[in-house]
């Protein structure tokens, strides 16, 4: 989808910034379309479902089972639609992304991985991602959790802009 939007807008190459699942999409795009990506900023992303903390992954799987079960019983229309959408989202989180060592090592663009030690993505997983991507930098934002980007966008923006300037982008 990212490359299709770029084609529609006549954008040959781009710096792609993604948050959470958007970070996963950005990394997948860089892996599959290396010629289209100048750089990636991946905020609170994961390469594999097991990159989530055990508690977060368990919560996702339990909620998935709950919503899946609710789809099988008679429900009012609005509740049924919510059950379907919730199950789809949680199923995505439980099974995707699938960016293994091979896919990450194919990324040619420089990558900035921003995360926090209190993120639902395990810090060790973020470091592992950085080890697999040839030109990457992992930055732990002090005191950050999964949603800190949405609360302290200026602090994240400063990290991002400094890194982009350093890379000449």
Residue ranges and their predicted role:
Residues 12-51:
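Conserved hydrolase catalytic core segment
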Residues 1-14:
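Conserved acidic catalytic loop of the alpha/beta-hydrolase fold
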Residues 136, 140-169:
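Catalytic active-site module of serine/aspartate enzymes centered on a nucleophile-bearing elbow/loop
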Residues 53-72:
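A catalytic-pocket lid/entrance helix-loop region that shapes and gates access to the active site
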Residues 87-103, 109:
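Active-site nucleophile elbow and catalytic-triad environment of alpha/beta-hydrolase enzymes
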Residues 120-125:
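Conserved alpha/beta-hydrolase "acid-adjacent" motif
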Residues 107, 113-115:
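Short beta-strand/loop motif that positions the catalytic acidic residue
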């Amino acid at each position: 989808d990212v490359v299709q939007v770029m084609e529609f807008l006549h954008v040959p190459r781009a710096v792609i910034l993604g948050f959470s699942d958007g970070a996963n999409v950005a990394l997948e795009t860089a892996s599959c379309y290396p010629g289209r990506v100048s750089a990636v900023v991946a905020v609170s992303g994961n390469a594999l479902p097991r990159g989530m903390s055990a508690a977060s992954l368990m919560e996702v799987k339990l909620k998935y089972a709950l919503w899946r079960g609710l789809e099988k019983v008679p429900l009012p229309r609005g509740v049924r639609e919510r059950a379907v959408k919730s199950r789809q989202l949680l199923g995505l989180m439980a099974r995707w992304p699938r960016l293994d060592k091979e896919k990450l090592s194919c990324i040619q663009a420089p990558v900035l991985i921003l995360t926090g030690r209190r993120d639902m993505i395990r810090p060790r997983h973020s470091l592992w991602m950085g080890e697999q991507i040839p030109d990457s930098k992992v930055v732990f934002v002090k005191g950050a959790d999964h949603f800190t980007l949405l609360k302290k966008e200026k602090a994240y923006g400063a990290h991002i802009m400094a890194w982009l300037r350093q890379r000449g982008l």
